[in-house]
């Protein structure tokens, strides 16, 4: 809550999270907020209470479907220290019911977190079905002159290679020349008839 120039006057309602500070002259020429002093321990209590109230209201109004953040042992130690610290500094307006309710909330959050972590860690892995596993086909022996016994023995200029290669070369050339002559005659006769 904000305080006006007089320390005893307090505003009853805060608009959002804004706090209005009024400055007073302390005699040294500098201005210091009236609500801030070294001996003012009430401010710390007010801030702690506001933090606890805001935590409770935000956790109740949250409708998010995602699981809450998992707490580490350090977080649980901090939560228990905060609870014991806040018990010692309770105002008369807070009752034992609020304290019990807060402890139940913390325990339920811890239980939910551990259940969620256990469910997540024990789920089956996403392995595709066996029919979708792609396998490379086995490589068949390619037809190549390099892998023949003729090439392994003597190379290109061996007698065995030349006996096979030269007749096939001559035959393919004769076929190509014959096909070329045939197509050429067909084209010349078709153009002369028009």
Curated annotation (Swiss-Prot):
Positions of short motif BH3: 100-125
Chain's role: Apoptosis-inducing protein that can overcome BCL2 suppression. May play a role in repartitioning calcium between the two major intracellular calcium stores in association with BCL2. Involved in mitochondrial quality control via its interaction with SPATA18/MIEAP: in response to mitochondrial damage, participates in mitochondrial protein catabolic process (also named MALM) leading to the degradation of damaged proteins inside mitochondria.
Low complexity bias located where?
Answer: 56-69
Q: Which family does it belong to?
A: Belongs to the NIP3 family.
Which gene codes for it? BNIP3
Gene3D superfamilies found in the cross-reference section: 6.10.250.1020
This entry's Gene Ontology molecular function terms read: endoplasmic reticulum-autophagosome adaptor activity; GTPase binding; identical protein binding; mitochondrion autophagosome adaptor activity; protein homodimerization activity
Question: What organism is the protein native to?
Answer: Homo sapiens
Keyword annotations: Apoptosis, Host-virus interaction, Membrane, Mitochondrion, Mitochondrion outer membrane, Phosphoprotein, Transmembrane, Transmembrane helix
An example of a Pfam family matching this protein is: BNIP3
Protein name (record) = BCL2/adenovirus E1B 19 kDa protein-interacting protein 3
Membrane-spanning parts: 164-184
């Amino acid at each position: 809550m904000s305080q006006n120039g007089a320390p005893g006057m307090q505003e009853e309602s805060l608009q959002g999270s804004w706090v209005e500070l009024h400055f007073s002259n302390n005699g040294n020429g500098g201005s210091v907020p009236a609500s801030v002093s070294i001996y003012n321990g009430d401010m710390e209590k007010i801030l702690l209470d506001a933090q606890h109230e805001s935590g409770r209201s935000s956790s109740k109004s949250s409708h998010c479907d995602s699981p809450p953040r998992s707490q580490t042992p350090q977080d649980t130690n901090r939560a228990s220290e905060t609870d014991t610290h806040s018990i010692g500094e309770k105002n008369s307006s807070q009752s034992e019911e609020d304290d019990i309710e807060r402890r139940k909330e913390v325990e339920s959050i811890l239980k939910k977190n551990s259940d969620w972590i256990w469910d997540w860690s024990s789920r089956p892995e996403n392995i595709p079905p066996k029919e979708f596993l792609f396998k490379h086909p086995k490589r068949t022996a390619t037809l190549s002159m390099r892998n023949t016994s003729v090439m392994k023995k003597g190379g290109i200029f061996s007698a065995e290679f030349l006996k096979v290669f030269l007749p096939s070369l001559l035959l393919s050339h004769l076929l190509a020349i014959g096909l070329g002559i045939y197509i050429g005659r067909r084209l010349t006769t078709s153009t002369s008839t028009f």
